[in-house]
Amino acid sequence: MKSSYNLRSIAAKVVGQVLDQGQSLSALLPIHQRDVSDKDRALLQELCFGVLRVLPQLEWCIQQLMAKPLTGKQRTLHYLIMVGIYQLHYTRIPPHAALAETVEGAVALKRPQLKGLINGVLRQFQRQQEELLQREATHSSHYLHPSWLLARIEHAYPNNWRGIVEANNQRPPMWLRVNRLHHTREAYLNLLMQGGIEAFPHTEYSDAIRLASPCAVDQLPGFSQGWATVQDASAQGCVYWLDPQDGEQILDLCAAPGGKTTHILEAAPKSHVLAVDVDETRLGRVKENLLRLQMHAEVKQGDGRYPDSWCEARVFDRILLDAPCSATGVIRRHPDIKWLRRDRDIEELVALQKEILDAIWPHLKTGGTMVYATCSILPQENTQQVTGFLSRHADAALVDTGTSEIPGIQILPHADSGDGFFYAKLVKN
């Protein structure tokens, strides 16, 4: 940790690295959090996530307040102003403290000559805040999504697109998966209650618990001993539909960071699991999760398009393919997705998913089950992908889950429920 730092300037740098360099917030934030005190880490996360969540609104306000935007080498100061406006409108930080710390951020960014400009813009926002936000509410920026994504969501869900967009813009709930090898869900709910943590069971998934308010993992009973895992309810649905059994050979493809790998082993502790991911670095997270839960799985680096290179002629009873996707179902959890994704990415991802599906299908035993899953809400990656797959593979059949008229199950993000997700359960005849 640095002995002296300005938190607002760090937040502005992080936002700039996401928007200008295309870096992932979830990869960047832990690096920068190491430079601040324990008490400031949560605030740094709040400022970075918050600015990226409401970015179009902040951009629109700055356009009204400044005749000329800050560009080039001064661009980070533009993001510093965003951090300032976000604090004034969305946080309980006393305005005088938010102003003072944000203005001082210009010094930390080696632009002390711009302190007066930043102070003036933020004070102007304070004076005009109510009128500005009333005007902004009628502007397209109010939806807080890029226009291409908004158009895709509206086209796919003409009757409820506004509800999806609204859910995307909310803070996500915190879900836990109770490790059934240690406790029943009811027993763990009692442990939470004894610790003063209010929580609610999921109506369908027997291991899932939603916390009334998010908390640090070190406050959770037995977290370090593997009694529970932080995992969204919709992600837990993957293993629910896979229905793994003891003694089976199971492939978890695109496995990182390992939440589903460990869930399989909780549901079927005597199964033989191979966890594969193309990203060697992220496979480290799989190993960390296995270690925390004291479980064993075979972990390999491998590209799903070329399974013969990492599993040769091996076949599996069950395959879970949580495919690379647009992640449009988890925007509320990763708001940088809105600004890192491009419209052209969707077709590229659809082609990649198709390639992996076709490549891995021969490695499923006859009579075996494959669950194809994404954290996307776009039909091209989900229902249309599955329909195309079934048309290419005569030995593939869709298992009727009795829950939907479409091929597969599409979950949409909802305030008190899970993230946006899609599952299709396929069997090889």
Swiss-Prot record:
* A single GO cellular-component term on record: cytosol
Give the main location.
cytoplasm
Under which name does UniProt file this protein? Ribosomal RNA small subunit methyltransferase B
Instruction: Give the UniProt subcellular location, in the record's own words.
Output: Cytoplasm
List the Pfam families. Answer: Methyltr_RsmB-F, NusB, RsmF-B_ferredox
Catalytic activity, EC: 2.1.1.176
Quote the function comment for this protein. Specifically methylates the cytosine at position 967 (m5C967) of 16S rRNA.
Q: Which GO terms describe its biological process?
A: regulation of DNA-templated transcription; rRNA base methylation
Q: Which family does it belong to?
A: Belongs to the class I-like SAM-binding methyltransferase superfamily. RsmB/NOP family.
Question: What reaction is this protein's catalytic activity?
Answer: cytidine(967) in 16S rRNA + S-adenosyl-L-methionine = 5-methylcytidine(967) in 16S rRNA + S-adenosyl-L-homocysteine + H(+)
Q: Where is the active site?
A: 375
Ordered alphabetically, the record's keywords are: Cytoplasm, Methyltransferase, RNA-binding, rRNA processing, S-adenosyl-L-methionine, Transferase
What PROSITE patterns would the database entry show?
A: NOL1_NOP2_SUN, SAM_MT_RSMB_NOP
Record bears the keyword ATP-binding = no
Q: Name one GO molecular function term.
A: rRNA (cytosine-C5-)-methyltransferase activity
InterPro entries, A to Z: MeTrfase_RsmB-F_NOP2_cat, MeTrfase_RsmB-F_NOP2_dom, NusB-like_sf, NusB_RsmB_TIM44, RCMT, rRNA_ssu_MeTfrase_B, rRNA_ssu_MeTfrase_B_ent, RsmB-like_ferredoxin
Top-rank lineage group of the source organism: Bacteria
Give the encoding gene's name.
Answer: rsmB
| Positions annotated to bind S-adenosyl-L-methionine | 254-260, 277, 303, 322
